[in-house]
């Protein structure tokens, strides 16, 4: 190959062949985002065929504003699944932040669990679960309600919600003992939607005549069951609602990400998401499921 000679000022540069362009390397750019984490709701206490169980606690609710991130950097994103009967919900995660799964409700064979919001207690002396566990500021959830109020045939406590403590059971006669309502969830400033309501506690009766049910908290909490008549209902999917007292599952959580409309979010293959259309200067993405705990989102 014949070398070429290029003159530059008073000197020259000798080389071989043709110069190749230097590839462009994207430079990370700082940006700010808002995001919401709602963990999976706790399952209702195991009714063992009879719904003598406290409601599950709503998943932890944590909202973050004006958080600094960089483009070209992958960030972990995980949506927590709801807990099965007598099982806590699973955590939701973005980057290094997490919301804790809701605690399961109590039943005659075991106590309620602590969690994002605590599970409801029962009439057998099993205490309600403690919310905001682990502790965050602001609080990610509240305690479950107390069961067996007044003694005798009192009902079961409602699960705590992200916005309020679970309701205590009410006591009349054995045929009129109601479970406590699930604690209300919290409203997201990003979406305006209420999430992470607690599940209603089960009603206890020994004469099969009381079919009154305790409602779940606003934000997807399931309805409590009635002993010997009906199991409770599950927490609603993608709300983090706790399951109603009696052989129920909590609802799955959700991750919401709000970014400037000049930017785009790209998710890894195991992420189920929707949204992303520009509106009012922003794009809002809803992440409703992740297939592994190693899924990511990258901004550009």
Predicted regions and their residues:
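Low-complexity, glycine/proline-biased repetitive segments and flexible coils/loops
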Residues: 2-23, 32-300
